[in-house]
Regions:
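Donor nucleotide-activated moiety binding/catalytic core segment of transferases
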Residues: 10, 58, 70-133, 142-144
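Intrinsic-disorder-associated interaction segments
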Residues: 50-53, 83, 104, 149, ...
Length: 178
């Protein structure tokens, strides 16, 4: 810590250098959450919360797809059961999207350097890695899934003011279209 500033240190990217190789427009990353109650964290923990998360994603995609010139690729992680609940609903609503299925063993930033914009849907290590690597990223999440330690609140408040973090999919889509 220097002065009043705390850095967002990510041990997963120490000594990593990313060469930007931008070929595509938008990479939207999301997670297939389990539909059964599980550990207490600020993520969807059961089907009701997963529906909120899924509906926010669909709303964002509808807003982005209206007159959009952007090519959108969706990257998702499945849960331990191989559940594709959210993905199946997205595929029903949108026929022309590209999907990449990954697992948690591969680091997300390995895909991210190829895109003009990365959209994260949870306040996670992946979001912090992209910020620390200076790759273009925004976070779009519901406030019920957003929790920040007290010591980092000021940093995250600044990210909200600078339009790096959004809680409304429509506002985020309007910002992306600028």
């Amino acid at each position: 810590t220097k002065g009043n500033f705390k850095s967002l240190f990510c041990s997963t990217i120490v000594a990593k250098t990313i060469r930007k190789n931008i070929k595509k427009d938008i990479l939207l990353s999301y997670t297939e959450w389990t539909l059964k109650p599980w550990r207490f964290m600020p993520f969807p923990k059961q089907i009701d919360e997963t529906n909120i998360y899924r509906d926010d994603l669909i709303k964002l995609l509808h807003c982005l797809n209206k007159n959009s010139q952007n090519d959108i690729t969706l990257k998702y992680n499945t849960d331990a059961d191989g559940n594709e609940y959210t993905t199946n609903e997205i595929k029903k609503n949108f026929k022309k999207l590209n999907f990449i299925q990954t697992n948690l063993r591969k680091r997300g930033f390995e895909f991210s350097s190829k895109y003009k914009l990365n959209i994260k849907t949870t306040n996670s290590t992946g979001f912090l890695e992209l910020l620390a690597l200076n790759l273009p990223v925004i976070l779009i999440t519901n406030k019920i899934f957003f929790d920040v330690k007290k010591e980092y609140k000021k940093i995250f408040e600044d990210l909200i003011k600078c339009n790096v973090i959004f809680f409304d999919p429509k506002k985020a889509a309007d910002f992306i279209k600028l």
